[in-house]
A protein has these predicted regions:
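Conserved PLP-enzyme active-site core in the AAT-like
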Residues: 2-26, 30, 54-72, 76-267, ...
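Conserved C-terminal alpha-helix-loop-beta "cap" of PLP-dependent enzymes
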Residues: 7, 286-379
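Generic N-terminal amphipathic, Lys/Arg-enriched alpha-helix
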Residues: 15-25, 34-43, 305-310
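N-terminal alpha-helical segment of soluble enzymes
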Residues: 42-50
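Flexible, glycine/charged-enriched surface loops at secondary-structure junctions
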Residues: 49-54, 68-69, 242-246, 265-275, ...
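Active-site pocket-lining segment
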Residues: 248-314
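Amphipathic/hydrophobic helical signal segments and adjacent flexible N-terminal regions
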Residues: 354-356, 364-398, 406, 487-497
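Central antiparallel beta-sheet cores of small beta-barrel/beta-sandwich binding domains
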Residues: 391-497
Length: 497
């Protein structure tokens, strides 16, 4: 390994220009200089971690206007230790028994359905029973002496006070003495007051390595001191189910330094700078006939960034937004951005396709590189997308499927019920669920898609391979869960006489 700017390339890993946002999978953010310097200085000495946590907690309270603060192991780690605090109350005899909550007075967490998400594994890991509710009335009816906590994600509407808002939930919960944890992981930080604490939340959790640009492995908890002292007790270096959520002295100091820096950053000027990046890109690519651009300014706190949408007719350019995003992310210099026209990937309109550029994690000079790359990519001559070849086989029927995961073999089943020329429909039975299966056959090349969907979880299956008579084989892409291999054998039904 080489140290310095080429550290990643020396390992055979090509860095990316981040035009997508604070996604952990691409590194989320870069440290503010103050955090970088603070972490370097922190690593030079030893310190007693409980004493450090008290000093950091007090200073975070001074900076934020909250009663107390804790640096956690990421936002998810913060959610976990806050849940542990809610069920233990700071009682170490309870702490060391988690996740076995037998004998605990409180073992339930209420979550509004719209707040159920993959990150609530951090809460489920504690062993609590999750109570999912759809309305404010259901939430209030679900509150009982066994309710340890309510977890929620805030509304994206500024100032929302309607049903299931932070304000409405906190008001109802306060009457029953139930703490409310707000997950504000990707939000811009608000201080003196924090908007969610001002709305009545007990604790608010942030990711340290997103908008705040602190250590990527750190999180930030602000709120009620008693609950947060129990949360700190639940985390490393203290033993128990939170021992794996370690926060080192460097992360503690780096996170505090990032919050200190946040109070001094010129946020309005930063947004003007980010908009300037997008204007540079927009001016360059809009010179191409048939390409349109629009810049959207942020209105809320979540993922607060100006965004540029670049749209075109896929029939004229022979490329979809996903084609363009894939090309830009897999060729040098690599650029990570989003496909689709609107927020969260929504298409711009029926006849347009697009890519979106988020500006807030771009670095000086990135705008010119990105402008040239997108201009050149859109200017390339591409052959028209060819018509699909005639299918080489009739795939209707049942298929026994063997999937080879990294360290396990699993048996699944395809039931292909319809084959309309190149288009296929049916079902995919996995080890745990049965799901819709859709796909295509192009000559002997097959692509199937299904998803094992559960409340707050989704395991995607994209099968791609080839068919040869009554057998199929190829690879499976599972999104964030990486890849596996599959083989399938058609079940030949005996002919009736």
């Amino acid at each position: 390994m080489k140290f310095g700017p080429e550290v990643y390339r020396s390992l055979g890993v090509e860095p990316v220009i981040n035009c997508r946002g604070t996604f952990t999978i691409i590194g989320a953010s870069t440290l503010v200089p103050e955090a970088k310097e603070a972490m370097y200085n922190a690593q030079s000495n030893y310190v007693q971690l409980d004493e450090l946590a008290m000093g950091v907690g007090k200073r975070l309270a001074e900076l934020s206007g909250a009663e107390w603060g804790v640096v956690s192991c990421g936002c998810a780690g913060g959610m976990k230790i806050t849940t542990m605090a809610a069920v233990t109350g700071g009682n170490p005899e309870k702490l060391v028994r988690i996740p076995d909550l037998t004998g605990f007075e409180k073992d339930e967490v209420i979550i509004p359905r719209r707040s159920r998400n993959t990150y609530d594994h951090a809460i489920r890991n504690v062993g609590v029973k999750i109570i999912t509710v759809d309305t404010q009335e259901e939430l209030e009816a679900a509150m009982n002496p066994r309710t340890a906590m309510i977890y929620m994600m805030p509304s994206t509407k500024p100032g929302d006070t309607g049903p299931l808002s932070v304000h409405a939930i906190s008001k109802a919960a306060k009457l029953k003495g139930i703490p409310v944890l707000v997950d504000a992981a990707a939000e811009a930080l608000t201080l003196n007051p924090n908007v969610h604490l001002a709305d009545g939340a007990t604790v608010v959790a942030y990711s340290g390595g997103k908008a705040i640009r602190g250590p990527q492995s750190a999180g930030l908890l602000l709120g009620d001191k008693k609950l947060l002292m129990a949360a700190w007790q639940s985390s490393a270096p203290h033993h128990g189910a939170g021992r794996d959520n370690k926060v080192g002295k460097e992360e503690q100091i780096g996170m505090l330094a990032a919050v200190e820096a946040w109070t001094k950053r010129n946020h309005a000027q930063e947004e003007l700078t980010w908009t300037g990046y997008l204007e540079t890109i927009s001016k360059r690519v809009s010179a191409i006939s048939g390409v349109t651009t629009s810049i959207r300014q942020p209105t809320g706190l979540d993922n607060r960034t100006p965004t540029l949408t670049i749209s075109w007719d896929p029939a004229k350019f022979n490329a979809s937004g996903q084609d363009m995003a894939t090309y830009l992310s897999t060729t040098k210099p690599r650029i990570a951005l989003s496909a689709g026209g609107g927020r969260r990937g929504a298409p711009a309109s029926e006849n347009l396709t697009s890519i979106s550029v988020a500006a807030f994690m771009m670095q000086p000079g990135d705008d010119k590189i990105v402008a040239d790359r997108i201009f050149n990519a859109l200017s390339m001559k591409r052959p028209a997308i060819p018509e699909m070849k005639a299918p080489s086989a009739d795939l209707k029927g049942r298929w026994d499927v063997t999937i080879e995961y990294f360290n396990e073999v699993s048996k699944h089943t395809f039931s292909i019920e319809q084959q309309d020329s190149n288009w296929l429909k049916g079902s995919h039975k996995s080890a745990f669920t049965t799901n819709e299966l859709e796909g295509t056959i192009d000559g002997n090349a097959v692509i199937f898609r299904s998803a094992s969907r559960m409340l707050a979880d989704n395991v995607p299956f994209t099968f791609s391979g080839t068919v040869n008579g009554d057998t199929m084989s190829g690879n499976i892409h599972h999104g964030e869960y990486l890849t596996s291999k599959f083989t399938a054998k058609k079940v030949i039904q005996p002919s009736s006489r």
